[in-house]
Amino acid sequence: MSAIRVDRLKKSFGDVVAVDDVTFEVQPGETFGLLGPNGAGKTTTINMIVGALCPDSGQVRVNGQDDPTRPEVRRSIGVAPQSLALYSELTGEENLVFFGRLYGIAKERLGGRVEWALAFAGLTDRRKHRVGTYSGGMQRRLNLVCGLMHDPRVVVLDEPTVGVDPQSRNLLFENIEALKKEGRTILYTTHYMEEAERLCDRVAIMDHGKLLAMDTVHNLLGQHGGPSTVEIEFDDRPSGLEALGGAWDKGRWRVQTESPVALLGKASAAGQLANVSIRRANLEAVFLNLTGRSLRD
């Protein structure tokens, strides 16, 4: 049974089609990424999955249940929304207690969940500080654990690292990777390609409300990423490279190829290699090849 199943989902706001015939499944324990620019339809899709929006047509099933608004379904889902769901005038601890009570956690269990959440987010020493004094990264980590207070098996993370510095982003990555190791199902939306490459088992690329491609990162790169770029410095500039294509640029030979390893073998036969760099295709290149534009356009 799929943890999440979305079948031919559609949603419009007036004349604007936000989600257009979207279908995908997320398996138990899988981290599934929805990758696309702002306005692609990712958050609208998420909101229909968690029951915050009703689709115009199509069906959502979570853990085999076909109505995400039912209390037992909502209890199985944890959500960290893109817009912070925090009360800035409350302390970090008070926010966690509030959300724990909102989820109906029993009093005898609530204290333990609060301690776990503070430790998991690295905020134990800031528990008595008002959230309004927290850094952006600290608020994002608190936002994450507020959605985990009831220990859900399905976790929905909508742009969880937006607006944070690189160090805070890495701390959030560590949190998410820890959730992966626990076997939780994670639905992850982002417009940062490197996040999807690092965290996701499979990725669906979305634009203008449609799914353009869906597969593992490795397969997407192989199918849509295009060639790798190889740059080589030689001890002495050899002859005979013209047959391999490419061009010289500031003392370096640069060539695009689908087979970097084979190319390096031929280049080493032509001369002694001094330095080699290989830039492989990434999800930015996949998106560019699928849409003809940059992910950040």
Where are these regions (language model features)?
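ABC transporter nucleotide-binding domains
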Residues: S2-V6, K11-D207, A213
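Non-catalytic surface loops within mature trypsin-like serine protease
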Residues: P28, D125, F234-D236, T257-S259, ...
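C-terminal coupling/interaction segments
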Residues: E258-D297
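Solvent-exposed polar/charged
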Residues: R75, G147, R198, G222-Q223, ...
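Solvent-exposed beta-strand sheet faces enriched in polar/charged residues
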Residues: D7, N63, E233, S277-R279
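ABC transporter nucleotide-binding domain
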Residues: L171-V261
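Non-catalytic alpha-helical coupling and interface elements of nucleotide-dependent molecular machines
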Residues: G104, G225, T229, G292-R296
